[in-house]
């Protein structure tokens, strides 16, 4: 008998069964289940549920890791769903289409390559805000441009839903994946073959933890790891660090969920919760709506964690009802949660290895920036921080210093929270009543993550107020938050260039890394939706938003922020009256009623040879199919701390003078249709030219005459010592077949779950990366591409080793999970230094993937050997 059958029991009050993880844990140690944190209880159920092919001792060895809080052995995790946006989701499916070709060429059956786990792809990353919210026809124009630019991509995506099994596609113009996941796709409790079990999910975006707010373990992964899960493989893991965060107190009047999450992000970054599963509990957590919780969970990657969990409680049930879920499903969620010990009241006995406390009443009105989401500051401190200065608007009609050139209400972080959206709309209404206007140089936009926002704002009579101030709906997509802010007015852009202006962006997004939002917005600031509206009126980051005068009313009254900020009571009254279950049903029932798609005539995609968007991937051929020597490697770059995936493989608009822009011009694309780096990631010939193409990069191998590090997408080719553009350096090394290494500081690879940040360096010939530390998703992606992550021991770094880029490097030793290896450094003067480093292949499975050359090579081997899942 399978190890788990003894724990399969009837679910009370239903005709379903469930796996009793409590009983399985109690069989090992009495009273153990009550002490488990929420995360461990979900993981325990997943282990018991999927233990149909292992014996009881094996199952108990896995459960013992949870009970004893140990991190000694790997255990499998099988997520129930994979959610994708069109960039990484498309890239993953391009890989699977390429895998089909590779299998067919070796005599295998390509039709067997299919996702076996439910895979949901939402097209939300492709739309650029070319027309701002002051254009009444902006939505139509932006969608038409999106369709024209992305015809190749959308052709492929439409093919996938007919060619692959278990793939659902939500086409462009319908919303953001995380918000749709929250409002519709996640059932919280799944049912399969008569068994109820917790919904779990991985997504090809670092903000996938958005639905952790519902009590669903939902984590961001790279496209390569998503492919592993799609194909039914276990995601091998060790028990993560689990940190309890007790939320106390009650927020002050006028404080939004955005203010709370920016304060929490600063707090949790300082507390170093990197890679941890954070669990919120306490009276403060209970008081937060699901909208507020989702705003917090969404920014999980910004505070460095893997997940940000809230247990299921009455707020969860109320939200499921509000969003139009079926009554039977809502009842099942409550029944299952209370039976399985997942109801918040059952978590009072949970024991956390580490507990932090955060007082909600301490939160003031906040912003974050520039450059980092955890760089929080209170708006009352703008002057003290040196941002706000005595402000006088230029009388000559020119832009002021610190001009806000983009003000965007964007991102599922905030638009999935009706309270934040309504607050912005009410502030816009109040501003209109006093005759306030947006400044003419501010490109304003409103891009909700759900069509429901449009309905409740219309019914409340508030959408017209937003439109009057320039915040008409430009899209239901990610837009500015993922760098798709679109072109500026040419006159405004030229003025920025001619006057070398310090121009900025203010957005309600979740990231503000340098260069991400727009090439001409030197810095960006995160703020709540109502503050975004206020800054559109103010027009400059130098404006003291709390104290300076926004305008003068008809009767001569000076209008400040406090005069237009809506009360909590007014916000709550609008939400209570105008946000209704039927609105969600009206949006989502037709969206998901896709009918029966006709099956594609061939399992193989007919690649378009001139496409710059979709191209057969090269991962099973040429140099990538060969051995990695890990000897004689030269450094492509020596990099500082906090290198993000935006530095490694940017997402924003492709400029004509860039390597990718020059390539696209040669391929015959007009400059206005270059689109973004992100949209071209299905074509490796375009995408690899994005590698380290961020103009904000600091490669410490490239110096100015005064010895300071020179900024730009630059590299120094050795042994000649010649400085050139990064892409030319990569081409030079590729032609020489020169193996490469990257040396970096702490927190390498933070930010978006961007598999091209790993693919790009591997295609360049990088075989290893030695850093002081890695962000979780990027480290996994590197392994998935066959790049070896190495971590310096504490106290050792590029500075202590006095590295200058003239060295060559070898890696010596047997690769074992977190074992010691030796980085052998050969200096130019003939000296050799041996440096112990940690092999950051953290699990036995990761070692196997690396040795195979990466996950794609591993898949091909398994399918050809008949070991496919």
Stretch-by-stretch model annotation:
Residues 553-570, 574, 778-849, 864:
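Acidic, glycine-rich flexible loop/linker segments
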Residues 52-247, 258-262, 365-368, 381-477, ...:
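Long, structured ligand/cofactor-binding scaffold of large enzymes
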Residues 78, 97-152, 280-388, 546-606, ...:
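Terminal amphipathic helices with adjacent charged low-complexity linkers/tails
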Residues 281-288, 510, 731-775:
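Extracellular/luminal Protease-associated
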Residues 39, 192-331, 343, 428-440, ...:
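Mobile "lid/hinge" segments at catalytic clefts and subdomain interfaces of large enzymes
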Residues 131-134, 288-297, 320-328, 415-421, ...:
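Short glycine/threonine-rich loop-to-helix capping motif typified by GTGT followed
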Residues 1-144, 288-298, 302-326, 609-649, ...:
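N-terminal amphipathic, basic-rich helices that act as targeting or association modules
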Residues 87-96, 198-225, 289-312, 371-373, ...:
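Conserved phosphate/anionic-ligand binding catalytic regions in large, soluble enzymes, centered on
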């Amino acid at each position: 008998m399978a190890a788990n059958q003894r724990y399969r029991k009837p679910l009370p009050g239903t005709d379903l069964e469930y796996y009793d993880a409590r009983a399985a844990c109690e069989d090992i140690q009495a009273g153990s289940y009550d002490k488990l944190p929420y995360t461990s209880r979900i993981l325990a159920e997943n282990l018991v549920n999927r233990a149909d092919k292992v014996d009881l001792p094996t199952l108990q060895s896995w459960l013992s890791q949870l009970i004893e809080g140990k991190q000694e052995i790997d255990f499998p995790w099988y997520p129930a769903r994979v959610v994708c946006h069109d960039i990484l989701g498309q890239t993953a499916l391009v890989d699977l289409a390429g895998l089909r070709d590779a299998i067919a060429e070796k005599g295998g059956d390509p039709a067997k390559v299919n996702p076996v786990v439910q895979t949901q792809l939402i097209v939300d990353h492709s739309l650029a805000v070319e027309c701002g919210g002051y254009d009444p026809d902006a939505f139509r124009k932006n969608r038409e441009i999106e369709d024209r630019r992305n015809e190749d991509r959308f052709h492929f995506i439409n093919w996938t839903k007919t060619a692959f099994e278990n793939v659902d596609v939500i086409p462009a113009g319908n919303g953001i994946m995380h918000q749709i996941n929250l409002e519709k796709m996640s059932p919280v409790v799944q049912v399969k073959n008569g068994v109820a079990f917790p919904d779990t999910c991985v997504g090809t975006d670092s903000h996938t933890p958005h639905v952790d707010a519902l009590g669903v373990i939902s984590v961001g992964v790279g496209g390569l790891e998503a492919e592993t899960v799609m194909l039914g493989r276990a995601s091998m893991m060790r028990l993560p660090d689990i940190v309890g965060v007790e939320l106390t107190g009650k927020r002050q009047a006028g404080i939004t969920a955005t203010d709370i999450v920016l304060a929490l992000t600063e707090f949790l970054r300082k507390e170093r919760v990197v890679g941890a599963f954070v669990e919120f509990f306490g009276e403060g957590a209970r008081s937060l709506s699901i909208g507020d919780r989702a705003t917090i969970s969404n920014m999980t990657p910004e505070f460095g964690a893997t997940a940000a969990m809230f247990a299921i409680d009455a707020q969860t049930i109320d939200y499921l009802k509000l969003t139009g879920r079926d009554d039977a499903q809502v009842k099942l969620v409550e029944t299952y949660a209370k039976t399985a010990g997942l109801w918040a009241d059952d978590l009072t006995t949970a024991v956390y290895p580490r507990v932090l406390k955060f007082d909600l009443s301490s939160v003031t009105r906040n912003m974050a920036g520039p450059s980092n989401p955890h760089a929080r500051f209170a708006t009352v401190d703008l002057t003290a921080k040196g941002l706000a200065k005595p402000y006088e608007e230029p009388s000559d009609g020119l832009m002021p210093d610190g001009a806000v050139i983009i003000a965007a209400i964007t991102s599922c972080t905030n638009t999935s929270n009706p309270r934040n959206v309504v607050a912005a709309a009410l502030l816009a209404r109040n501003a209109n009543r006093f005759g306030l206007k947006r400044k003419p140089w501010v490109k304003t936009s409103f891009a909700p993550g759900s069509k429901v926002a449009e309905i409740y704002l219309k019914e409340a009579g508030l959408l017209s107020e937003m439109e009057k101030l320039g915040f008409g709906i430009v899209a239901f997509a990610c837009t500015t938050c993922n760098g798709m802010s679109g072109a500026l007015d040419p006159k405004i852009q030229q003025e920025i260039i001619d006057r070398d202006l310090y121009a900025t962006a203010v957005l309600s997004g979740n990231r503000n890394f340098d260069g991400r939002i727009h090439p001409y917005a030197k810095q960006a600031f995160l703020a709540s939706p109502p503050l975004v509206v206020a800054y559109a009126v103010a027009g400059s980051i130098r404006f003291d938003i709390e104290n300076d005068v926004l305008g003068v009313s008809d009767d001569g009254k000076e209008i400040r922020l406090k005069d237009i900020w809506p009360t909590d009571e007014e916000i709550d009254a609008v939400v209570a009256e105008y946000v209704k279950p039927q609105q969600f049903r009206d949006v989502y029932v037709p969206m998901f009623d896709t009918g029966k798609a006709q099956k594609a005539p061939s399992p193989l995609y007919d690649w378009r040879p001139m496409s710059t968007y979709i191209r057969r991937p090269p991962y099973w051929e040429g140099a990538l199919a060969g051995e990695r020597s890990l000897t004689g490697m030269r450094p492509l770059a020596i990099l500082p701390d906090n290198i993000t995936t935006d530095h490694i493989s940017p997402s924003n608009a492709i400029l004509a003078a860039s390597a990718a822009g020059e390539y696209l011009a040669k391929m015959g694309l007009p400059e206005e249709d270059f689109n973004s780096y992100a949209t071209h990631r299905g074509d490796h010939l375009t995408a690899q030219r994005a590698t380290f193409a961020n103009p904000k990069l600091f490669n410490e191998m490239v110096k100015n005459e005064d010895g300071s590090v020179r900024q730009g997408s630059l590299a120094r080719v050795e042994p000649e010592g010649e400085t050139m553009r990064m892409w030319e350096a990569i081409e030079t090394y590729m032609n020489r077949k020169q193996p490469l290494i990257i040396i970096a500081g702490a927190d390498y690879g933070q930010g978006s779950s961007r598999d091209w940040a790993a693919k790009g360096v591997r295609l360049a010939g990088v075989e290893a990366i030695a850093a002081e530390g890695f962000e979780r998703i990027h480290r996994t992606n590197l392994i998935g591409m066959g790049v070896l992550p190495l971590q310096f021991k504490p106290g050792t770094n590029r500075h202590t080793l006095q590295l200058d880029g003239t060295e060559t490097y070898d890696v010596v030793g047997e690769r074992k999970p977190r074992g010691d290896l030796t980085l052998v450094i050969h200096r130019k003067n003939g000296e050799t230094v041996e440096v112990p480093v940690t092999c950051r292949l953290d699990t036995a499975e990761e070692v196997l993937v690396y040795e195979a050359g990466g996950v794609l090579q591993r898949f091909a081997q398994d399918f050809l050997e008949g070991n496919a899942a």
